[in-house]
Amino acid sequence: MKETIAQHLLDIEAVTLRPNDPFTWSSGIKSPIYCDNRLTMGYPHIRQSIAEGFEQLIRSHFPEVTVVAGTATAGIPHAAWVSDRLQAPMVYVRSKSKGHGKQNQIEGKLSSKDRVVIIEDLISTGGSVIQAADALREAGADVLGVVAIFTYGLEKGQDQLEAANLPSYVLTDYPTLLDVAIRRGDISEEELQKLQKWRENPSSQSWMNE
């Protein structure tokens, strides 16, 4: 499954590898990779593979789930498709409460008896997932963990998820993506070294001199 999903993401350029012309993230970090998993919505066969993968992960690791929660906005469509496959209720979680109406941060029906799995499109530093988990826990729900399409596997993200008591499982990951990309000829050996070096210390720009 990991290789298949990685191939899908590369095929539609949901993940773009550009070590010789790096992207600048909103945090200011220079990155050789950019991920926009929202593009998967436009490909029915790919989003079906993702939904099937999520269903397998949830049934395997979180069989006691009663509610599926999508993170706004990218996790919402995938949460809808997965909750349909599981025949489970769905909610979604905003990054912050609305400034009008009932000022809800969580949309949908949730009770203190619910056991929730969060659906995310990408795990980077883990901040958005933890924010969603905090909101769900404040509402009284038992947050079992998170499943995501892809992760950079950054040490900071892994540490923060562990500290927040959030087990996480992904459909594919950074090493798998690089393996697929080098085999397909999408990147050279020199570019592979830069990509590997970046993940060791994303806040440093030393990888650009590899």
Swiss-Prot record:
The keyword Signal does not apply. One of its GO terms (biological process) is 'de novo' UMP biosynthetic process. This is Orotate phosphoribosyltransferase. It holds the Pfam family Pribosyltran. It is an enzyme of class 2 (transferase). Gene3D superfamilies: 3.40.50.2020. 5-phospho-alpha-D-ribose 1-diphosphate binds at residues 94, 98, 100, 120-128. The keyword Magnesium applies. One of its GO terms (molecular function) is magnesium ion binding. Keywords: Glycosyltransferase, Magnesium, Pyrimidine biosynthesis, Transferase. Belongs to the purine/pyrimidine phosphoribosyltransferase family. PyrE subfamily. InterPro entries: OPRT, Or_phspho_trans_dom, PRibTrfase_dom, PRTase-like. Transmembrane segments: none annotated. SUPFAM superfamilies: PRTase-like (SSF53271). Pathway: Pyrimidine metabolism; UMP biosynthesis via de novo pathway; UMP from orotate: step 1/2. Its cofactor is Mg(2+). It comes from the Bacteria. It catalyses: orotidine 5'-phosphate + diphosphate = orotate + 5-phospho-alpha-D-ribose 1-diphosphate. Catalyzes the transfer of a ribosyl phosphate group from 5-phosphoribose 1-diphosphate to orotate, leading to the formation of orotidine monophosphate (OMP). Orotate binds at residue 124. The gene is pyrE. Homodimer. Its EC number is 2.4.2.10.
